[in-house]
Amino acid sequence: PDRPDRAEVGVRVHGSRLPRRQIEDLDGLPVTSVARSAVDVARGRSIEDAVVVLDSAARVLAVRAGVELRRLRHDEDLRASCAEHARAELWAAYRAVRRWPFTVVVRSAIPLLDPASESPLESRSRIRVMSSELPTPRIAVPVVGASGTTYYADFVWDEWRVIGEADGTAKYGEDPVSVRTRLR
């Protein structure tokens, strides 16, 4: 009677048996695998939220495979390979829960993941562009600036000579001066 209902404190409890391959050891503590955790978190979310979660999981899986995150933006073959590996892991986790409620969004989001996405804002922007009537942009495109420095544009529409960037406080920090300086 004195114990609050878990729903009141914002906790959702999902009880089920886990396949052994979806359990990992973290400092002696059994935890769900990255893929299973991502699938569980993405269930019942919006497509944008689900893709944010799956992009993050794909990056974690890439790092665990020894990939330097910087290379994901620069090496298209590596990026494709990491995406394929992440999708395989996530599909395996999805199959264990495919008959559960709220899994349709996971099935829709897995093909959209991109391990090179650097922030939730970038993931959300990519999904919004994909769901708009805009042509599909090239993603993470090297662009050489006037100084000769190479930058990587989040989105490029060559036919319009337009670059799209999805940057915010996650990249530049909360300090308004730093944000203004970086955006100049």
Residue ranges and their predicted role:
Residues 1-102:
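Short gly/ser-rich loop at a beta-strand->alpha-helix junction or flexible surface loop bordering the NTP-binding
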